[in-house]
């Protein structure tokens, strides 16, 4: 089944709230690209991830309030409903500044049934959502989007908007089979967004999302990290969907299926008062160290409080993983919460090399920072 999202001219308005320059965070590294608003509190609920553990350690980290999820009960009745897990990621994020709370959904898992089920069980009210964010154009991050919007369009605010990383989000994606042939991995079809009256805008450059969240824009490739094997991409349009090939180089416009370098990927960040940067990397194809360093450069804030999300290290060999963990440790974050595609080798290496920073996560967990 092809996953599709919609064709829409660039909409800069509703999601591009260039906020007032507020007080900046702890330590500066250089002049900031944009002023990073301070927030007082950040809560992240994992709506979809690849596993659900009932018996993880419930002990809080000194810097994070950790809430583990059990079996859901709908409406207080005796009917039990399970939290579902699948390959993919979706996060429900609440940020609060000066008593004002903003609510964003970052990524949407692979299928709408799992996202809708889990969001309902975990108490997410679609009517309270201020915005939607897509980290990159992989089906396990946008697959639940259209179904979730269609299910809740009447409840969602009329001006709800989607922020994506770049034009590449809308390119056709492919997976190479063992026999060397390609099979479709889906496409974001902008026609669906148009049908559901959801405008979209890009974050190819650093920008604010609403008045509390920050997008890194395109992530600079400056560390030892490399894009590990994943999917393939085709630049151009066919069957009424795809990406505008005029946006790319002459070589990319040849229409060949090539390895995806994820130039469109961006990270979502927050400036937590008195603590520093919280960097959320949904998949980290561009490199988790690169993502953090780009966030530092964009905001001018050196202190990293938390690194959260998918780091795409599950295909990596142990020595490479250890090198990346050492690089993360050198950034001196207070907290590291790996999810999704980070991989068991990363968790094991982090537990060995920086156990005081590691917090584990599964579907349904909620983490509160700034408590």
Residue ranges and their predicted role:
Residues 51-53, 58, 65-122, 261, ...:
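Conserved beta-strand hairpin/beta-sheet module of binuclear metal-dependent hydrolase folds
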Residues 93, 119, 136, 212, ...:
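Divalent metal-coordination and catalytic microenvironments
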Residues 113-164, 299-308:
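Active-site metal-binding motif and surrounding structural segment of the metallo-beta-lactamase
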Residues 1-18:
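N-terminal secretory signal peptides and thylakoid transit peptides that target proteins
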Residues 24-45:
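C-terminal segment of N-terminal export signals and the immediately downstream linker at the start
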Residues 166-195:
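Active-site neighborhood of divalent metal-dependent phosphoester bond hydrolases
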Residues 208-268, 274:
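Active-site-proximal loop/helix segment associated with metal-binding centers of metalloenzymes
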Residues 131, 138-142, 161, 247-367:
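Cap/insert and terminal regions of metallo-dependent hydrolase folds
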């Amino acid at each position: 089944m092809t996953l599709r999202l919609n064709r829409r001219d660039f909409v800069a308005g509703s999601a591009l709230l260039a906020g007032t320059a507020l007080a900046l965070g702890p330590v500066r590294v250089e002049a900031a690209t944009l002023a990073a608003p301070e927030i007082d509190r950040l809560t992240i609920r994992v709506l979809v991830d690849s596993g659900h553990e009932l018996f993880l350690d419930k002990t809080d980290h000194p810097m994070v309030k950790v809430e583990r999820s059990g079996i859901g009960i709908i409406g207080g009745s005796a009917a039990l409903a399970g939290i579902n897990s699948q390959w993919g990621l979706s996060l429900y994020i609440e940020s609060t500044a000066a008593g004002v709370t903003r609510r964003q959904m970052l990524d949407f898992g692979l299928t709408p049934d799992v996202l809708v089920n889990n969001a309902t069980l975990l108490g997410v009210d679609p009517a309270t959502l201020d915005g939607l964010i897509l980290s990159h154009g992989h089906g396990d991050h946008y697959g639940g989007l259209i179904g979730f919007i269609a299910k809740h369009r009447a409840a969602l605010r009329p001006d709800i908007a989607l922020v994506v990383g770049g034009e590449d989000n809308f390119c056709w994606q492919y997976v190479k089979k063992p026999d060397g042939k390609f099979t479709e991995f889906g496409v974001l079809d902008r026609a669906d967004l148009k049908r559901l009256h959801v405008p979209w805008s890009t974050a190819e450059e650093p920008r604010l999302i609403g008045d509390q969240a920050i997008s890194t824009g395109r992530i600079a490739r400056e560390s030892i990290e490399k894009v590990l094997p994943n999917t393939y991409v085709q630049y151009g349009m066919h069957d009424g969907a795809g990406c505008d090939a005029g946006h790319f180089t002459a070589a990319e416009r040849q229409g060949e299926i090539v390895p995806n370098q994820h130039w469109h990927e961006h990270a979502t960040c927050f400036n937590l008062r008195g603590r520093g940067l919280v960097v959320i990397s949904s998949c980290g194809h561009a490199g988790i160290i690169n993502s953090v360093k780009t966030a530092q450069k964009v905001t001018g804030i050196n202190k990293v409080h938390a690194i959260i999300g998918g780091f795409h290290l599950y295909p990596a060999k142990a020595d490479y993983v250890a090198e990346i963990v050492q690089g993360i440790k050198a950034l001196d974050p207070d907290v590291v919460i790996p999810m999704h595609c980070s991989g068991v080798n990363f968790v094991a290496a982090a537990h060995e090399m920086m156990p005081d920073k590691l917090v584990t996560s599964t579907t349904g967990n909620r983490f509160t920072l700034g408590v």
